[in-house]
Amino acid sequence: MLENHKTKLVLFDLDGTLIDTAPDFLTSLNNVLNKYGKKNVTAQEIRNHISEGSSKLIKFFFEIDYEHEDFEKYKSDFLSEYKKNLNKKSKLFEGMPDLLDYLDEHSIMYGIVTNKFFEYTDPLVNSFPELKNIKIIICPDHVKTSKPDPEGILLACNKLNIRPEETIYLGDHPNDLKAGLSAGTKIIGCLYGYSLEKNSNELFDCHFVEEVSEIISKID
């Protein structure tokens, strides 16, 4: 007999929570850095900055400010490169297919609320057959204010007619957890991702997991 859950909806952040997109970010950024004679970066270096967005990636790794005359050119080149590479090496985090199967078996809906624009999110998600049962995708294109504002999470809940208190939001960045808390959902911090520190449990009163396989036991 299947266990009955109070949770009706699980919402995922995308980069660093649902999908490990770091390899394709690394390829794309290094291609542009090489183009302009800049030093390559390592996988670990870029993992620490993926969740900050493309503008901050360019600012940090090109070591320029936003007003630099070539900033927009570098950013445009990076985004073009990323669009070509976004589903080449990216993969679901280990254990994620089993988690999604569990949610399907228990009739728990799941979706994505991300700060990644739909132009990049849609082809990435569609390249994974395991994500065919995703019920909703909310990107910055769909809201006035992105995370840490709760608007995207609340929009997803509203569209699926699920109350926030029946929802879990999973993320790997402090802004994800802030958004979930503000929306009134339960939250789970994903330490296997890119941006949460090991001491995050001192800042947020919620469950934390170091592996995807730990998530099922946290679904009430």
Could you say what each language-model-derived stretch is?
Residues 1-8, 44, 118, 122-220:
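Asp-based, Mg2+/Mn2+-dependent phosphohydrolase catalytic module
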Residues 4-98, 105-106, 131:
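N-terminal helical cap/lid subdomain that shapes the substrate entry/recognition surface
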Residues 13, 17, 114, 172:
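Conserved G/P- and acidic residue-centered "switch" motifs that form tight phosphate/ATP-binding loops
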Residues 20, 112-114, 189:
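Hydrophobic residues in well-ordered beta-strands that form the structural core
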Residues 29, 99-126:
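Substrate-recognition element of Asp-dependent hydrolases with the DxDx(T/V) motif
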Residues 49, 113-115, 170:
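Structural motif
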Residues 53, 91-95, 116, 148, ...:
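Short beta->alpha linker loops
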Residues 97-104, 177-181:
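Surface-exposed amphipathic alpha-helices with a cationic face
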